[in-house]
């Protein structure tokens, strides 16, 4: 007898003995497809964020050489200003990351949008899982699963296929894998994600410390991404290798139907091709009109942010979660001191140790005024040890000394009731402009209530020493509720305005205008 008829007869006998009567309901198939689509968006946008600071640590000080893993060969010199975090950024192809081309602002926006829908899809999936009793497919109910899973692992290791009788609907090893992904890996990603928010960490310092710190949580988030990526590759591979006719007809039609195997193959492979093409198309759609993409993507995240991070502000001054021993020996910076070509005025002031510097404070106030550094120090002084969080991923802890913006604004009379924002302008210049026009002075805008927070100061000192040029001398804004791109350096003026849409490109600051970040930097 030839081998082919024998194999066919054997398969038929097995099928008769182990009839496949499992049903994959529509809700299961739909949520799986949505999860597949969104996980690709999350991983690709996550890669874009990683490329902005391709180093991972377990300590919040982020000292060069303390990385446990890095995706760059660059060595970081310890001299102040010799190497910046911006120098570390990588420009990736849109085929790999979302959107690619070093557009971290848009990558972060995509990550936020995808996270919102992924969470919603997950809640729906778990609700159906519990409500229909399908949880027993994933949740082990006996310790017998462990030796059975070991037997399955040995079977796969010997490149053999487990019997169809072992799948109810999954074999023990696959059941453990699904249980781990759904009930351990997914919650890990959910609980570590908020630690990336300066508003959350500033309001609840204990939450970050629960994971060992913000950087430890960031590293756990990366490990979770690797777990998901590895699981997806193995999972899709096994679908096509182990009892593929059963798997594919279940995925497409909900039950095993030998007469529709070919149709199932075409549908599944075609769907994968379309989804991969869609992932790549998202990148090029985003890059085709970056301003349009910025508006649409960030607007899409506002709803969930209003319910979550927008409710929090930093209370590091009151809670004092950091002490002198936590201060970073090395603190990353993102830009360099303005050159003479960029700002001759700044260089002249710096040459005289800012003795002639005066901070202009005006706009929608009744008594505009200007102040020297000595006059500012005479008004009030506050020191705070806080953690700086950069949207690239790195952190640094330092002691900042300066005047609360609230105390400063109290010196310039009444604030117009229509004033809702505070604009801070810098001696520094933007790296580039959105439309390619000549670069303009760097600026940022804060909502008035955030500018009046206890943790918001204009700092003239760092770690009990005068502020250096690299860190923003003569004055540097510290707004601990926000990411670092709002903490403008080399501040020359403070202006009360009606709304941020009336200045610059109308997006809320230089990083928003040309870097496509959001004016709300709480996450």
Locations of the language-model features?
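Short acidic (Asp/Glu) patches
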Residues: 99-104, 372-374, 406
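His-enriched metal-coordination microenvironments in redox/metal-binding proteins
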Residues: 111, 174-184, 221, 353, ...
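A glycine-rich, hydrophobic loop/mini-helix early in the fold
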Residues: 348-400
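Membrane-embedded alpha-helical bundles that constitute the cytochrome b-like, heme-associated redox core
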Residues: 1-311, 523
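Short, well-ordered loop/turn elements at secondary-structure boundaries
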Residues: 35-37, 184-185, 223, 354-355, ...
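Extracellular-facing segments of soluble proteins and assemblies that are Gly/Ser/Thr-biased and enriched
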Residues: 109, 116-141, 155-158, 387-429
């Amino acid at each position: 007898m030839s081998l082919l008829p024998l194999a066919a007869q054997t398969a038929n006998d097995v099928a008769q003995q182990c009839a496949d009567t499992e049903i994959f309901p529509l809700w299961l198939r739909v949520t799986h497809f949505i999860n597949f689509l969104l996980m690709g968006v999350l991983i690709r946008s996550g890669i874009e964020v990683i490329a902005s600071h391709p180093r991972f640590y377990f300590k919040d000080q982020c000292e060069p050489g303390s990385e446990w893993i890095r995706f760059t060969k660059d060595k970081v010199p310890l001299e102040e200003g010799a190497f910046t975090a911006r120098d570390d950024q990588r420009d990736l192809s849109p085929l790999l990351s979302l959107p690619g081309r070093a557009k971290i602002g848009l990558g972060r926006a995509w990550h936020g949008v995808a996270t919102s829908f992924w969470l919603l899809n997950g809640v729906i999936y778990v609700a159906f899982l519990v409500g229909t009793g399908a949880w027993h497919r994933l949740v082990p109910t006996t310790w017998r699963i462990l030796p059975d899973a070991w037997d399955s692992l040995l079977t796969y290791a010997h490149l053999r296929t487990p019997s169809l009788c072992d799948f109810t609907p999954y074999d023990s090893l696959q059941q453990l894998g699904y249980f781990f992904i759904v009930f351990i890996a997914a919650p890990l990603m959910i609980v570590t994600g908020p630690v990336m928010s300066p508003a959350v960490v500033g309001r609840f310092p204990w939450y970050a410390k629960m994971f060992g710190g913000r950087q430890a949580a960031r590293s756990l988030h990366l490990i979770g991404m690797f777990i998901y990526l590895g699981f997806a590759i193995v999972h899709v591979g096994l679908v096509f290798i182990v009892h593929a006719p059963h798997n594919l007809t279940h995925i497409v039609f909900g039950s095993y139907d030998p007469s529709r195997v070919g149709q199932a193959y075409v549908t599944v492979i075609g769907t994968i091709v379309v989804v991969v093409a869609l992932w790549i198309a998202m990148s090029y759609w985003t890059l085709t009109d970056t301003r349009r993409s910025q508006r649409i993507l960030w607007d899409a995240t506002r709803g969930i942010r209003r319910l979550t991070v927008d409710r929090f502000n930093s209370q590091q001054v009151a809670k004092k979660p950091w002490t002198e021993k936590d201060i970073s020996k090395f603190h990353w910076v993102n830009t360099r001191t303005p050159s003479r070509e960029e700002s001759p005025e700044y260089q002249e002031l710096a040459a005289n140790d800012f003795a002639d510097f005066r901070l202009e404070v005006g706009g929608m106030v009744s008594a505009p005024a200007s102040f020297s550094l000595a006059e500012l120090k005479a008004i009030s002084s506050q020191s705070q040890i806080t953690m700086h969080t950069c949207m690239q991923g790195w952190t640094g802890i330092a002691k900042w000394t300066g005047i609360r913006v609230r105390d400063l604004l109290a010196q310039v009379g009444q604030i117009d009731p229509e004033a809702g924002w505070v604009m801070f302008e810098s001696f520094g210049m933007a790296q580039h402009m959105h439309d390619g026009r000549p670069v303009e002075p760097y600026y940022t805008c804060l909502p008035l209530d955030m500018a009046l927070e206890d943790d918001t100061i204009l700092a003239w000192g760092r770690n009990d020493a005068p502020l250096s040029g690299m860190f923003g001398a003569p004055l540097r804004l510290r707004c601990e509720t926000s990411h670092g791109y709002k903490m403008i350096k080399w501040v020359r003026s403070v202006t009360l305005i009606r709304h941020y849409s009336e200045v610059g490109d109308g997006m809320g600051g230089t990083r928003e205008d040309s870097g496509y970040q959001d004016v709300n930097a709480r996450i």
